[in-house]
Design a protein with these regions (language model features):
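Helix-loop-strand module that forms the ligand-binding subsite of alpha/beta enzymes
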Residues: 304-347
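Metallo-beta-lactamase
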Residues: 22, 27-30, 67, 74, 124-247
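Active-site neighborhood of phospho(di)ester-bond hydrolases with catalytic His/Asp-centered motifs
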Residues: 70-72, 94-102, 122-125, 185-188, ...
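Conserved beta-strand hairpin/beta-sheet module of binuclear metal-dependent hydrolase folds
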Residues: 25-87, 176-179, 183-187, 280
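Short helix-loop-beta junction
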Residues: 285-300
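Active-site metal-binding motif and surrounding structural segment of the metallo-beta-lactamase
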Residues: 76-123
């Protein structure tokens, strides 16, 4: 009952907040608008990553002689998103829907969008259209497809979009889009972070945790994308999750280079532990004291993981050294450490 009550309290808090922020859009540069949504109902992103500050699902509109909508949002926000798009369009009709990534939190509303704007042309690569046909069996895109190859361009007027394929960052069909006019990179899931946009928090921590959980296994693919990005004059990064990045872009690019090449970000050490009766905790505390006395530049971080496996693996990812103190149940690791032990297989 307590869990049910907590859910409904959170739900109604969300509904009140949603009403207050209804049709809240944001202009980026001269002709680009943010039309994304905040999700404060989600507790576990993708069913496993704790997101205490929710998530954002980002979408954008480019208004030029031709109008392009960049990606859709999660299925739980159809009406809110379509309302924001309509507000920005202000009676105009979109010419293109650009689909960079087919994961449902970004692609769920393709069919709903096409019902609202049936004359729109969908812009995507071949793999994306194959996925689309399987996702939306009843959707007819005959005569409404614009298939792009890597490096192809699309002219909207003064805005020229260049499509750069980024397979396995983190799905096989992913591509990013560069607007050479406003020098904006629409980066798909790259440079995303956990957290809704109406909550202010440090980028590095939640972006690192997002990267490890969602993209971390695909370091070589991210490195390839970074090399392509290095040839572009990028002044703004518009990801599909998290804030729009407009300042100090070198910092974000450097972080992605470190994470994707698995370099050491900090010389500290983390000791993660779980403890039933307190004995493992005491051992972990003693180990941390000993490690701290060794003159480590960044000291020692002690973390009780409990049920939040993403916190444990996220905490040790940037460090040179990590220790684990765990207890066993019937000769097996408890689930949180079984997860952390397998993390190298992912990253």
């Amino acid at each position: 009952m307590r869990a049910i009550r907590k859910y409904f309290q959170k739900y109604w808090k969300y509904k009140i907040q949603q009403t207050k922020e209804e049709l809240n859009t944001m202009k980026i540069g001269n002709d680009i608008y943010y039309v994304g949504v905040n999700d404060h109902r989600v507790d576990l992103f993708e069913g496993q990553y704790v997101v205490p500050n929710g998530m954002s699902y980002n979408s954008y509109v480019i208004k030029d002689e031709k109008i392009a909508v960049m990606d859709t949002v999660d299925a739980g926000f159809t009406e809110e998103w379509l309302g924001k798009v309509a507000e920005v369009l202000d009676g105009a009709k979109p010419d293109y829907l650009v689909v960079q990534h087919m994961e449902p939190d970004h692609a769920a509303n393709i069919e709903n969008f096409m019902k609202a704007y049936p004359d729109t042309t969908v812009v995507a690569n071949t793999k994306t259209f194959t996925m689309m046909e399987n996702f939306f069996r009843g959707m007819d895109l005959e005569g409404k497809k614009h298939i792009v190859a890597n490096g192809d361009t699309l002219t909207l007027g003064k805005h020229v979009l260049t499509f750069v394929f980024a397979p396995m960052v983190h799905w096989p069909e992913v591509m990013v889009t560069y607007d050479s006019t406003d020098k904006v990179l629409f980066s798909a899931d790259g440079f995303g972070k956990f957290g809704a946009l109406d909550v202010e928090e440090d980028w590095d921590c939640e972006a690192r945790r997002y990267y490890i959980g969602i993209v971390g296994k695909y370091g070589p693919q991210v490195q390839k994308l970074l090399k392509a990005a290095a040839t572009l004059d990028i002044q703004t990064i518009c990801p599909l999750h998290g804030p729009i990045l407009t300042e100090n872009l070198g910092h974000y690019l450097e972080k992605y280079d470190i994470w994707s090449s698995y370099k050491v970000e900090s010389e500290g050490v983390m000791i993660a532990y779980t403890s039933v009766y307190g004995h493992t905790k005491k051992a972990a505390e003693l180990s941390c004291t000993e490690a701290g006395g060794k003159g480590l530049p960044e000291g020692c971080c002690l973390r009780s993981c409990k049920r939040r496996h993403g916190r444990g693996s996220g905490g040790c990812f940037p460090l040179r050294q990590a220790g684990i103190g765990q207890h066993y149940i019937q000769r097996r690791s408890i689930p949180v450490y079984a997860y952390i032990h397998r993390e190298p297989d992912r990253t």
